[in-house]
Regions:
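Juxtamembrane "anchor/assembly" segments of surface/extracellular structural proteins
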Residues: 1-44, 86-90
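Envelope-exposed proteins and targeting segments
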Residues: 4-6, 16-20, 44-46, 60-62, ...
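Solvent-exposed coil/turn segments that connect beta secondary-structure elements
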Residues: 13, 25-27, 53-55, 65-72, ...
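Surface-exposed cap/loop segments at beta↔alpha junctions
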Residues: 30-121, 134
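Extracytoplasmic/secreted envelope proteins and their assembly/folding machinery
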Residues: 63, 107-110, 142-146, 199
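Short beta-strand-centered interaction patches in the first periplasmic/extracellular domains
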Residues: 73, 80-89, 124-189
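Helix-rich terminal scaffold detector
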Residues: 99, 163, 189-195, 205
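Charged, gly/pro-rich, cysteine-poor intrinsically disordered low-complexity regions
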Residues: 200-206
């Protein structure tokens, strides 16, 4: 069957769970039905793969699971199905947990946190410092992972269930060049000096 797509929005970000929003035309007013919504394709928990490209040359740009499924109907009878998706790593954000990590490095802790989820894989830069004990107290695995990554100056990126935890690369050639007026669709940049101090003085003792 053919499903009419209104829009697809995919969001990737550093230290963020990737997500996608799919808007589809849906609604059979004479029969009071929503056939696309009633099907199993977009039910919560369903695995979604989004491919994009030109002609027959497409590649996967997002893979995740449906986390939210909603119907919207406007006054002009414009009805649509809105599907919110998240990368499978969203499971790490569910529930607050407690754990003790004894004689462990941060890289070992991060790998262990990710390894607790069968749908995820990891690529974690090795760290050197071993701690006698670290405590995860009433904190989701995702939040604790971000905390330990930040301690080491690492960034967390995710693609199709693979969680990469590495230091940012500030040298080498750019992997992408965008040109104003050619391929830059939208851009927003701000400089906010509202909380900028002209002078900072500190006093400390030991």
């Amino acid at each position: 069957d053919t499903i009419q797509i209104v829009s697809i929005e995919i969001i990737y970000g550093v230290n963020k769970i990737p997500g996608a929003k799919i808007v589809l035309l849906d609604g059979d007013m004479p029969n009071n039905k929503f056939p696309v919504s009633d099907a199993d394709d977009f039910k919560p928990g369903a695995v979604i793969t989004i491919n994009a490209g030109y002609a027959n040359q497409t590649s996967t740009v997002f893979k995740g699971i449906v986390v939210k499924h909603g119907i919207k109907l406007d006054g002009d009878n414009f009805s649509r199905l809105i599907v919110q998706c998240k990368d499978s790593s969203v499971a790490m954000t569910v529930g607050r947990k407690n754990a003790n990590f004894v004689d462990s490095k941060d890289s070992d802790i991060i790998s262990k946190l990710i390894g607790a989820y069968s749908d995820l894989s990891s690529d974690v830069t090795d760290t050197t410092v071993s701690y006698k004990e670290l405590v995860q107290y009433y904190c989701s695995d995702w939040d604790y992972l971000l905390t330990r990554a930040e301690v080491n100056g690492f960034l967390v990126t995710i693609d199709a269930g693979k969680v990469t935890v590495k230091a940012p690369q500030v040298d080498g050639e750019a992997v992408l060049t965008l040109t104003y007026g050619i391929d830059l669709m939208a851009f927003s940049a701000d400089v906010d000096a509202a909380a900028q101090f002209s002078v900072v003085k500190g006093i400390a003792w030991s």
